[in-house]
Amino acid sequence: MGFLKFSPFLVVSILLLYQACSLQAVPLRSILESSPGMATLSEEEVRLLAALVQDYMQMKARELEQEEEQEAEGSSLDSPRSKRCGNLSTCMLGTYTQDLNKFHTFPQTSIGVEAPGKKRDVAKDLETNHQSHFGN
C-alpha cells in the first residue's frame, strides 16, 4: 500500500540518486559540464519510470473518483452538513458570530478609554485653565 503513495518528487529524486551512484562520486563540476548524453536513461529505467508514473496516475484517478462519490453522497438534502450550511450567508454569519465571540472573550489590555489609571475630567481641566488665565 505504501508503494502506491509515491509522489512524483520522490520518484524523480530516486532516479537522480541512482544516476549519481552510477557516476561513482564524480565531482559536481564535471557533472554540470558533462554532455547531455550522460543524463539519458536506460531502457529498463524508462520502463520503470513509465510504470511508476502510470501507477501514480491511476492512484490519483481512483482518489478523485472516491472524492466525487463522497461529495455526491454528502450533497444529499438529508445531510446535516447541507442543512447546517445550506445557505452561504448562514455559514458566514456563523463564522462572524464565532469571531465576534472570540473578540469579546479576548483578555482586556490596559490601553484605551476604559483603561485603569489616572482619569481626567475634561470640564474641570478647562475650568482650572480658564481661571488661571483670569487670575481668579
Swiss-Prot record:
The modification Phosphoserine is found at S42. Residues 26-82, 121-136 form a propeptide. Keywords: Amidation, Cleavage on pair of basic residues, Disulfide bond, Glycoprotein, Hormone, Phosphoprotein, Secreted, Signal. Pfam families: Calc_CGRP_IAPP. One of its GO terms (molecular function) is calcitonin receptor binding. Disulfide bonds join C85-C91. InterPro entries: Calcitonin, Calcitonin-like, Calcitonin/adrenomedullin, Calcitonin_CS, Calcitonin_peptide-like. It is found in: Secreted. The keyword Signal applies. Glycans are attached at N87. Residues 63-84, 114-136 are annotated as: Disordered. GO terms for biological process: adenylate cyclase-activating G protein-coupled receptor signaling pathway; artery vasodilation involved in baroreceptor response to increased systemic arterial blood pressure; cellular response to nerve growth factor stimulus; detection of temperature stimulus involved in sensory perception of pain; feeding behavior; inflammatory response; intracellular calcium ion homeostasis; negative regulation of blood pressure. Calcitonin is a peptide hormone that causes a rapid but short-lived drop in the level of calcium and phosphate in blood by promoting the incorporation of those ions in the bones. Calcitonin function is mediated by the calcitonin receptor/CALCR and the CALCR-RAMP2 (AMYR2) receptor complex. Belongs to the calcitonin family. PANTHER family: CALCITONIN (PTHR10505:SF16), CALCITONIN-RELATED (PTHR10505). This is Calcitonin. It comes from Mus musculus. The lineage of its organism: Eukaryota, Metazoa, Chordata, Craniata, Vertebrata.
